[in-house]
Amino acid sequence: MTTSLPFVLANHGFALNFNVFETNLINLVLVIALLVYFLKGFLGGILERRREAILADLKDAEERLVTASKALEEGQRELAQAKSTAEKILAEAKQRADLIREDGEKRTIEEMARIKQDANANLNAEAARVIEALRAETARTAIDKALAALPKRLNDAKRAELIDRSIEALG
């Protein structure tokens, strides 16, 4: 059953009722006025408490923001100090490593020089021993040859003269 707007207007009519008593307008105004009067304090109290809670939350949030900002600044300061300390430690470590490397190089050079001196001393000692051995062998060979040739070269007169000179040299 569909009814159209023109049908409703034609049969029932459309009009505004301005009769205050029939429309309950007075009752509505009274009820609304009483609700506003009595609920004003109730709703106002609720809204005031809510406002105070929001303000307290805002104040707490601001305090936490200030605290967090201070903590952040302190953390950044400590981070900068830690970076500075780390850079100093790194620089000292590099310097110490360079000193250790230089000391190691110096000790290596000194040890090489000492080994070279020891080798030269050993070589000189061995050369002196070989020279002494050669001298002794040469002297022994010369003495042997001289002793072998001596009987052929010496006669009795020269032998006696040699003995006399040797005795005088000793004596």
Swiss-Prot record:
Localization per Swiss-Prot or TrEMBL: Cellular thylakoid membrane
GO molecular function: proton-transporting ATP synthase activity, rotational mechanism
Main location as per UniProt: membrane
InterPro entries linked to this entry: ATP_synth_B-like_membr_sf, ATP_synth_b/b'su_bac/chlpt, ATP_synth_F0_bsu_bac
Disulfide bonds: none
Segments traversing the membrane: 26-46
Entry membrane topology: Single-pass membrane protein
Record-level GO cellular component terms: plasma membrane-derived thylakoid membrane; proton-transporting ATP synthase complex
Record keywords, A-Z: ATP synthesis, CF(0), Hydrogen ion transport, Ion transport, Membrane, Thylakoid, Transmembrane, Transmembrane helix, Transport
Top-rank taxon: Bacteria
SUPFAM superfamilies: F1F0 ATP synthase subunit B, membrane domain
The keyword Thylakoid is assigned to this record: yes
Keyword check for Ion transport: yes
PANTHER family registered for this protein in UniProt: ATP SYNTHASE SUBUNIT B, CHLOROPLASTIC (PTHR34264:SF3)
Described function: F(1)F(0) ATP synthase produces ATP from ADP in the presence of a proton or sodium gradient. F-type ATPases consist of two structural domains, F(1) containing the extramembraneous catalytic core and F(0) containing the membrane proton channel, linked together by a central stalk and a peripheral stalk. During catalysis, ATP synthesis in the catalytic domain of F(1) is coupled via a rotary mechanism of the central stalk subunits to proton translocation.
Subunit comment: F-type ATPases have 2 components, F(1) - the catalytic core - and F(0) - the membrane proton channel. F(1) has five subunits: alpha(3), beta(3), gamma(1), delta(1), epsilon(1). F(0) has four main subunits: a(1), b(1), b'(1) and c(10-14). The alpha and beta chains form an alternating ring which encloses part of the gamma chain. F(1) is attached to F(0) by a central stalk formed by the gamma and epsilon chains, while a peripheral stalk is formed by the delta, b and b' chains.
Protein name as annotated: ATP synthase subunit b
